[in-house]
Amino acid sequence: MDPVQLLSFLLALLLPLGTALDASKQKRDTAFEIYKKLFEVKRKDQINALNNLIELNDVNQQYKIIDIMLKGLFKVLEDSRAILIAAGVQPDGPFPEDEKIKDAYSHTVENSAFFGDVVLRFPKIVHHYFDRNSNWNNLIRWGIGFCNLSGIFDDGPHTQLLGLMSQELGISEKSPDYKNPFKMDNMEFLPNTDAFQKALREEEKRRRKEEKRKEIRKGPRITRSRSEL
């Protein structure tokens, strides 16, 4: 899968899977259980996409893709939080029936989990963006709290995800036995790889050029005086 196709696939994963439920005919607890099964399907797609990203074996491409992906992810998370708060949805309450609220619920749970996958597999790249963005920090803290109370992560293969990502991000204190389970699987973890440092320098250079171009475009314009008109 080439980088463009992979990026399109990753961005598509930021959208909810959908529940295909007739809520009026299902008990709310049944709707929640059905969603949990659909959540597992979405999680498999997310993991497969990240495995493809790892297999690119190109730090520059990974850097650019993750940059775009994280901006989209946190925009979705921010919009979803606004919807859920406005609707007064409690994460440990009944599973929502309204389609818009249901989508916001799915967005929150799925994208919070997906961000955990990304930070555990690409910690250095994610930290480079995340650590300087207080808005993202606040959003993911809220997302983790929502997920912890939702009950979706209480059992199954994702029970440790929220705790691991919280420790990796510095949201919670690292336990003495903390270990990133993916640390040996990805060369991105090497502390001073030439490839990563080169990608970092190139990205910073690109950002400075882009900021300079924006400043030039926003610069003062020459206007004619009334006497010249």
UniProtKB/Swiss-Prot annotation:
Compartments it resides in: Endoplasmic reticulum lumen
Region (Disordered): 201-229
Entries under InterPro entries matching the protein: Coiled-coil_dom_con_pro_134
Pfam families xrefs: ERK-JNK_inhib
Tree of life domain: Eukaryota
Residue ranges of coiled coil: 192-218
Disulphide-bonded residues: none
GO biological process: positive regulation of MyD88-dependent toll-like receptor signaling pathway; positive regulation of Wnt signaling pathway; regulation of protein glycosylation
Ranges of compositional bias, category Basic residues: 219-229
Family membership noted in the UniProt record: Belongs to the CCDC134 family.
Motif position, Prevents secretion from ER: 226-229
PANTHER family listed in its UniProt record: COILED-COIL DOMAIN-CONTAINING PROTEIN 134
Coiled coil as UniProt keyword: yes
Listed GO MF terms: protein-macromolecule adaptor activity
Source organism of this protein record: Xenopus tropicalis
Described purpose of this protein according to its UniProt entry: Molecular adapter required to prevent protein hyperglycosylation of HSP90B1: during translation, associates with nascent HSP90B1 and the STT3A catalytic component of the OST-A complex and tethers them to a specialized translocon that forms a microenvironment for HSP90B1 folding. In the CCDC134-containing translocon, STT3A associates with the SRT pseudosubstrate motif of HSP90B1, preventing access to facultative glycosylation sites until folding is completed, preventing hyperglycosylation and subsequent degradation of HSP90B1.
Protein name: Coiled-coil domain-containing protein 134
Entry keyword set: Coiled coil, Endoplasmic reticulum, Signal
GO cellular component: endoplasmic reticulum lumen; extracellular region; nucleus
